[in-house]
């Protein structure tokens, strides 16, 4: 199974949840019904648990993210960057099989691919603070 590819799909689905207001289960089931996407290499359990975990802990994740922002409000962060922050913060807090530093590095890679270069240092800074506060 390819965790990097699975994390990319998790980002896309977390973003979809954010813009459509679908539940995690609706979003995941819609993804599973899409026959155009090969799921052979994906860690579907990781994707599903990530979506459900983000939905279940959204207030806690957002509160933790917002507490690390300097001169920013959560509603100013792009939906893509917010989705990246939520995924990584969720992993730092709850995913025992993903070391925090690995999650931060993967978030930076997602940011480079799906956002802009200016956001990389922002994402890195916020997640580094989240990680250090969890130690």
Curated annotation (Swiss-Prot):
Q: Does the keyword Transcription regulation apply?
A: yes
Entries under InterPro entries matching the protein:
NusB-like_sf, NusB_fam, NusB_RsmB_TIM44
- The keyword Nucleus belongs to this UniProt entry's keyword annotation: no
A Gene Ontology CC term for this entry? cytosol
Which GO biological process annotations does it have? DNA-templated transcription termination; transcription antitermination
Keywords of the record: RNA-binding, Transcription, Transcription antitermination, Transcription regulation
- SUPFAM superfamilies from the UniProt entry: NusB-like
Q: Look up the coiled coil feature and give its residue ranges.
A: none
Q: Which Pfam families match?
A: NusB (PF01029)
What are the recorded GO MF terms, alphabetically? RNA binding
> Which purpose does this protein serve, as stated in its record?
Involved in transcription antitermination. Required for transcription of ribosomal RNA (rRNA) genes. Binds specifically to the boxA antiterminator sequence of the ribosomal RNA (rrn) operons.
Family listed: Belongs to the NusB family.
Name of the molecule in the record:
Transcription antitermination protein NusB
Species assigned in the record: Clostridium perfringens (strain 13 / Type A)
């Amino acid at each position: 199974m390819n965790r990097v590819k699975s994390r990319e799909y998790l980002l896309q689905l977390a973003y979809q949840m954010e813009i459509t207001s679908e539940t995690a289960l609706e979003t995941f089931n819609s993804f599973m019904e899409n026959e155009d996407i090969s799921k052979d290499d994906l860690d579907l359990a990781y994707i599903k648990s990530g979506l459900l975990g983000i939905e279940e802990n959204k207030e806690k994740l957002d509160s933790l993210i917002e507490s690390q922002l300097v001169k920013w409000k959560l509603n100013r962060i792009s939906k893509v960057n917010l989705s990246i922050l939520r995924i990584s913060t969720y992993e730092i807090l709850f995913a025992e099989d993903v070391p925090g530093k690995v999650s931060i590095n993967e978030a930076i890679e997602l940011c480079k691919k799906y956002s802009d270069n200016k956001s990389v240092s922002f994402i890195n800074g916020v997640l580094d603070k989240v990680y250090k506060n969890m130690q």
